[in-house]
Amino acid sequence: MDEYEDSQSPAPSYQYPKETLRKRQNSVQNSGGSVSSRFSRKSFKLDYRLEEDVTKSKKGKDGRFVNPWPTWKNISIPNVLRWLIMEKNHSGVPGSKEELDKELPVLKPYFVSDPEDAGVREAGLRVTWLGHATLMVEMDELIFLTDPMFSSRASPSQYMGPKRFRRPPCTISELPTIDAVLISHNHYDHLDYGSVLALNERFGSELRWFVPLGLLDWMQKCGCENVIELDWWEENCVPGHDKVTFVFTPSQHWCKRTLLDDNKVLWGSWSVLGPWSRFFFAGDTGYCPAFEEIGKRFGPFDLAAIPIGAYEPRWFMKYQHADPEDAVRIHIDLQTKRSVAIHWGTFALANEHYLEPPVKLNEALERYGLSCEDFFILKHGESRYLNTDDRAFEET
């Protein structure tokens, strides 16, 4: 993708309750064309104890969001400098395209050649890894993306900052029709300005954006009209597909895009609950008690997308980035039948060797008595289909 500039200013069948709309004061009324809004619909009816045990989002005295668990430690400037200056970087990404093609091949996604084949009806779920935390998920007659990142750099500028060493498997113009996009948080490797502009240019107001609390204004300044902003445990749906519920669920991370906007935007994960399939997207996260809460409330999931990379050194990264063993613990807490690895093999964002995450994942799976089919790795551009009737996987 060409250069972009970010201005910065700018299971069973369920019975759902009636919807309650809460608009921000600066939101445009639906009749005026924009459907961007704060929207909340109370989640499924739960027993009282579980409802009380759910962790809600919290703000500090300065009005900024905070992580509410003892598993979190705030990131300090001295520790950032210690990491950048004192720690050795072992990422070892080769400069040779031939070697990268051998170790991390980029496949042409099936839908580039056969766009009419995209979409899964009734029982079944298909996931395609497009690099880093970007997935195309097809389930319950919907197609949606997670944290779309198609640019060359995860940075405010396409001239500097972390550069991807594996190209996107496809362009935005080669995607099939996308119904929705899920955004987990506002870091540059997960909320990419150029990708947002390109997706909005192609799909316009037909594309529904699900974003965390605090991100609505930024999305509107990008020209996106169909934006739904949610707090933890709030839910919404795509118009015409009200049997599939998108719930914004917790994670342990942080947000920042400019010098002074630390944690003014919430971060989180996504639970997508349909009549045939259930999918979970962790986004970017450290290990925390939230995943057990999510598993108890919405599990078992058919498939979870869990990060396994950007984890070294542990003294610094463990609070914000799960390592492969943490990822397996998250897999277990979520009560998910299968998981797919994300957040590795695309950008060198931490100090582990670029090929280490899958190796460490398989070692952790063996320690926990799980197999590589329980928590699997995809090549860039590769798809896997899950029949949610008999749980049998097929590669494409």
Curated annotation (Swiss-Prot):
Its cofactor is Zn(2+). Residues 1-39 are annotated as: Disordered. Disruption phenotype: Knockout mice are born at the expected Mendelian rate. White adipose-tissue specific knockdown (effective when differentiation of adipose tissue is complete) causes obesity, adipose tissue inflammation, insulin resistance in the liver and profound changes of gut microbiota composition. The keyword Metal-binding applies. Induction: Down-regulated by neurotoxin 6-hydroxydopamine. Widely expressed. Highest expression in brain, spinal cord, kidney and testis (at protein level). Expressed in adipose tissue (at protein level). It is found in: Golgi apparatus membrane; Early endosome membrane; Nucleus envelope; Nucleus, Nucleoplasm. Activated by divalent cations. Activated by bile acids. Activated by membrane phospholipids such as phosphatidylethanolamines. Zn(2+) 2 binds at residues 189-190, 284, 343. It catalyses: an N-acyl-1,2-diacyl-sn-glycero-3-phosphoethanolamine + H2O = an N-acylethanolamine + a 1,2-diacyl-sn-glycero-3-phosphate + H(+); N-butanoyl-1-hexadecanoyl-2-(9Z,12Z-octadecadienoyl)-sn-glycero-3-phosphoethanolamine + H2O = N-butanoyl ethanolamine + 1-hexadecanoyl-2-(9Z,12Z-octadecadienoyl)-sn-glycero-3-phosphate + H(+); N-hexanoyl-1-hexadecanoyl-2-(9Z,12Z-octadecadienoyl)-sn-glycero-3-phosphoethanolamine + H2O = N-hexanoyl ethanolamine + 1-hexadecanoyl-2-(9Z,12Z-octadecadienoyl)-sn-glycero-3-phosphate + H(+); N-octanoyl-1-hexadecanoyl-2-(9Z,12Z-octadecadienoyl)-sn-glycero-3-phosphoethanolamine + H2O = N-octanoyl ethanolamine + 1-hexadecanoyl-2-(9Z,12Z-octadecadienoyl)-sn-glycero-3-phosphate + H(+). It is a peripheral membrane protein. One of its GO terms (molecular function) is zinc ion binding. GO terms for biological process: host-mediated regulation of intestinal microbiota composition; N-acylethanolamine metabolic process; N-acylphosphatidylethanolamine metabolic process; phospholipid catabolic process; positive regulation of brown fat cell differentiation; positive regulation of inflammatory response; temperature homeostasis. Its EC number is 3.1.4.54. Binds 2 zinc divalent cations per subunit. GO terms for cellular component: early endosome; early endosome membrane; Golgi apparatus; Golgi membrane; hippocampal mossy fiber to CA3 synapse; nuclear envelope; nucleoplasm; postsynaptic membrane. Keywords: Acetylation, Endosome, Golgi apparatus, Hydrolase, Lipid degradation, Lipid metabolism, Membrane, Metal-binding, Nucleus, Phospholipid degradation, Phospholipid metabolism, Zinc. It is an enzyme of class 3 (hydrolase). Pfam families: Lactamase_B_2. The modification N-acetylmethionine is found at residue 1. An N-acyl-1,2-diacyl-sn-glycero-3-phosphoethanolamine binds at residues 188, 321. Belongs to the NAPE-PLD family. Homodimer. Bile acids promote the assembly of inactive monomers into an active dimer and enable catalysis. D-type phospholipase that hydrolyzes N-acyl-phosphatidylethanolamines (NAPEs) to produce bioactive N-acylethanolamines/fatty acid ethanolamides (NAEs/FAEs) and phosphatidic acid. Cleaves the terminal phosphodiester bond of diacyl- and alkenylacyl-NAPEs, primarily playing a role in the generation of long-chain saturated and monounsaturated NAEs in the brain. May control NAPE homeostasis in dopaminergic neuron membranes and regulate neuron survival, partly through RAC1 activation. This is N-acyl-phosphatidylethanolamine-hydrolyzing phospholipase D. It comes from Mus musculus.
